[in-house]
Amino acid sequence: MNAGLSRPPRLPEPPGLPVLGHLPPWTVNPLRLLETGARTGPVFRLRLWRPAIVGYRPEWNRAILSDLATFRSRGSLSGLSPYLAAGIVHTDDPQHRPRRRGLSPHFSARALAVTEDRLAAVAQARRPRGDFEALSWSAALVQDMLNVALFGGALPDALLSRFLRPLHHRLPAPMLPRPLVFRRLEAAIAATLADPDPDSIAAGLAAGDAQPGGGQAGAEAVENLRVALAAGYDTTSHTLAWAVWHLARHPQWRDPQALPLFLDEILRRYPAGWLGSRIAARDSVVAGVPVPAGTLVLYSPYLTHADPSLWEDPHLIRPERFTAGQPAWSYLPFGGGPRTCLGVHLARLILRTALTPLAQSDLAQVAGNPAATVGITLRPRGPLHLRARQ
């Protein structure tokens, strides 16, 4: 640790404006800004509303994601959206670790196994037939599957749609407060917690063992379920839409035995969490770069997954690359370290279950624009029109 660092180090940076810095290109096209910055080196500076440093090599990722005491979530970009500025996502150490330990068992692969048959039934019922648009189809399917997994299917569809719909809109829609909708959703979650489906995640949180030594308070359980719903919705539905689009072009990957590698590759090529952020709580040195306290520290799975020094032909869909090992901290579709996405097992289960019925279909791309754009998460620009024949 270095004491007394007061200013960000002199680092390369993409072209910006004298006063506004990088705010205009950040607002218009943040992906292009990141790509331009990456061409200046593996660590670069951005002049946003506060000094920011971006890195994307494994050693940077490891340092930022492993040290929870130095790099903290509160005050970072996740706090800009009311959908994410709550619950475990917005909790730092020393509270984070015990709360995470209490929540993790209810989101584990073992705990989720009891819902697999019900999720498969939902996927089969929404199996596309004829012409369909992948973004709309995946959004409806993932909403239903999250409702089953989290709440046993108890929440009203209309309320879920009203709460989740802004996440599909361009910024600033996901950043705007919606207190009435949030209160109605939280009331519905609280009612579900009072009498939960025994196979749902809500049942585990309601059982009183979601925190060591006492049980999770009702308001905290409601908050964590609301955040899990929002965080899992557009990330998983956008990934699913891309997966179906590319599955139509590469039928050899429809075999259920091949799907895991295919999904790994879709998650690499299109990481929904395209950018992660922390606030430096104290002066530090990361990958040889001094990082003063108060700096906005950014890591980018989007840049890491597109780094040709880590991934050969990174812009191609090549699932077979996952038959070999990858360098540690080079694959971050769900983040990494102690704050790895709590819903990683649920997301993978939903994706695999949603795609399995399509192995029996003849899929064809009709027309669409799969290019990536960003809101809170990475998403296809769309639309993505396909045709499914049985």
Region spans (language model):
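Conserved cytochrome P450 K-helix/beta-meander segment immediately N-terminal to the heme-binding cysteine loop
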Residues: 70, 300-325
